[in-house]
A protein has these predicted regions:
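Active-site microenvironments that recognize anionic phosphate/pyrophosphate groups
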Residues: 1-129, 135-192, 199, 213-215, ...
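Extended C-terminal subregions enriched in glycine
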Residues: 203, 207-220
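Alpha-helix N-cap/loop-to-helix boundary motif
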Residues: 193-207
Length: 289
């Protein structure tokens, strides 16, 4: 695929001292922080000339070249949010995630596909319209590889459990750099979204909505959050699909900043006890839908 004007070549730098991978993308310095004239994802906007339910578009400001970055539009309703959509609509988003992931996994130059969402100014979201993104990597990112090498599986610790149903489990992460961190996984071991059955896709969508609703009740307002889907890369034969949802809030409106002692050492100090958070989230039932 031809490289677009302004795109940086896919040639990330690696810090020789730490192994940290850095993509230098100078073109993104010109990316607008907020739309100057209306929302580009609303009907009639720059990216959405016609009404839609869910759809995808190429990212105009890609972090990587060669069509590796896409935007997943959840709804043409600017004020909708993933957790507020009907279960059917939310499942259609999971279906689109699976479809676009499969397209990219089919590329010979793709090893790993990441689906993610940034929601809220505190985590860098620049457009309020409900949307997520897809990044297609030609290698397996370190964290993805580390979780697979460690044999990640859903937690069996009842003290960390938040919710379990016929198809899906939700737990608080045992040890996370973020004060709030949830892990959602299908009960059946599958590696990719495309391998989920229709019932499992519905179950995953409902579990994600439930988790976000519980967090909203817990904080008494919708917190900023980051959500991403961990899928089996092309280099692996076995992995357990899971979704992570994290928030930088440690209390309503109070950020838990990751500062010098943590950045410099890679060790973190969290003020929220995961087991206590799980108990609170179990008690903060999600709103009926």
């Amino acid at each position: 695929m031809a490289q677009r004007d302004g795109e940086a070549p896919l040639n990330p730098r690696v810090d020789s001292a730490t192994g940290i991978v850095v993509h230098v993308v100078g073109s993104r310095q010109n990316r607008p922080n907020l739309p100057a004239t209306g929302c580009p994802f609303c009907v009639g906007g720059l990216e959405a000339p016609q009404p839609y339910s869910t759809t995808w578009i190429a990212n105009r400001w890609p972090a990587m070249p060669d069509g590796r970055c896409e935007v997943i539009l959840y709804s043409d309703d600017h004020d909708a949010r993933f957790m507020s959509l009907s279960h059917t609509h939310a499942t259609s988003i999971v279906d689109l995630w699976a479809e676009r992931s499969s397209v990219h996994f089919a590329r010979a130059d793709t090893s790993s596909v990441l689906i993610f969402e940034n929601s809220g100014r505190d985590v860098g979201a620049t457009i309020d319209h409900p949307h997520g993104q897809l990044y297609s990597f030609d290698h397996v990112p370190h964290r993805t590889a580390a979780r697979i090498d460690a044999g990640w599986v859903p937690s069996l610790d009842d003290q960390l459990s938040v919710r379990t149903d016929e198809t899906t489990t939700t737990s608080v992460a045992y040890a996370s750099a973020y004060p709030v961190a949830l892990e959602i996984a299908p009960r059946r071991r599958v590696g990719r979204l495309a391998e989920l059955s229709p019932d499992e896709r519905l179950g995953l969508a409902v579990a994600m909505q439930d988790a976000l609703q519980r967090l909203t009740t817990y904080f008494d307002t919708t917190p900023p959050y980051m959500l991403w889907v961990n899928q089996r890369p092309s280099t692996s034969t076995d992995a357990w699909l899971n979704v992570e949802i994290v928030s930088p809030w440690r209390a309503p409106g109070v950020m838990r900043y990751i500062a010098a002692a943590e950045v410099s050492t890679g060790e973190y100090f969290t003020p929220l006890v995961p087991e206590q958070l799980a108990r609170s989230l179990r008690e903060h039932l999600s709103s009926p839908r």
